[in-house]
Amino acid sequence: MTTQLEQAWELAKQRFAAVGVDVEEALRQLDRLPVSMHCWQGDDVAGFENTGAALTGGIQATGNYPGKARNATELRADLELALSLIPGPKRLNLHAIYHEAPEPVGRNEIKPEHFKNWVEWAKANKLGLDFNPSCFSHPLSADGFTLSHADDEIRQFWIDHVKASRRVSAYFGEQLGTPSVMNIWIPDGMKDITVDRLAPRQRLLAALDEIISEKINPAHHIDAVESKLFGIGAESYTVGSNEFYMGYATSRQTALCLDAGHFHPTEVISDKISAAMLYVPRLLLHVSRPVRWDSDHVVLLDDETQAIASEIIRHDLFDRVHIGLDFFDASINRIAAWVIGTRNMKKALLRALLEPTAALKQLEENGDYTARLALLEEQKSLPWQAIWEMYCQRNDAPAGSQWLDNVRAYEKEVLSQRG
């Protein structure tokens, strides 16, 4: 007997076909766009170094919801549940502080073997891995400077950390058969009026050049650099500004990372994608939700998330844009946060793929802006949810809010035992 879901699917297929959209092709294209989930939502960016260091770098995870992961075993178990509730291809994004070295190791001495468990787990779960050096929450970043530090020894420590991180990233790519995108973000900046804004940027430029001087196979590893407007304790000056990294990525042909929360509240990264793509080979997107500042709230299916997805699809940037998530909310169930945010990103991509873009572009070229606006608004109410639910069913993921039942059961059976 035909189920209600299948009936809705057939009717939705007809509705989209009427506006020239092939929904089966849309689903095939959706599978070309893995979303890289960030491991740090699971433990509030604590990592496994167990030094007791506070979270620094001008970032903040607020809330104290019970049950956060305390070690790699718990974090991977939580991730496995989240992954099972999200349809389609995924990746996992790791920070360097999530290594599993058997003994304490300096960040400048991390090695691929310290991440062997993650690689084996990724293979078992059919995931690609991405990576990040961790230039925060460390005694040598306590004064707010890392790669741009005026002290040669401290700066070299962080240079060596990022160099070591690139080798870990390349190991991921080599082992998993898909390049690891390694993003370099540093918190460097000053709280108050800064007299010499040039020297730290000169040091950062030289440090980055030294870091990327070691040639690595791009089939295994991709370098990305990320700007930021400000952070807590660095309100007046950020060394790695948008202009700095746009210039760096353009001149060195690295990937450029655009984080949705790293600009002025009235700026949106969806508007930056098409401009940046003219000058850099690749973009890494950190999709987040800034509320008045870079608060890293859970991603919603809101206008900006949709606009980001639409830019990727409309300009056929499948092979040049890498989609990552970057939020950390400790006030709600952390597994639910992963599921909500990642499903929303995938929903936005699907909705973009279901848009009759060719027809809309033709109206725009013809100067018929009335019809363009009318059709843009009408297509919002087309039955995309029926397509989403079929996609979930085909990928053995819950179609609707039933996924929350799985999370609640796990919370009762597992998370509640963590204290």
UniProtKB/Swiss-Prot annotation:
Pathway: Carbohydrate degradation; L-rhamnose degradation; glycerone phosphate from L-rhamnose: step 1/3. Its cofactor is Mn(2+). It is found in: Cytoplasm. Mn(2+) binds at residues 262, 294, 296. Binds 1 Mn(2+) ion per subunit. Its EC number is 5.3.1.14. It comes from the Bacteria. It catalyses: L-rhamnopyranose = L-rhamnulose. InterPro entries: L-rhamnose_isomerase, Rhamnose_isomerase, Xyl_isomerase-like_sf. Its main location: cytoplasm. GO terms for biological process: L-lyxose metabolic process; rhamnose catabolic process. Homotetramer. This is L-rhamnose isomerase. It comes from Enterobacter sp. (strain 638).
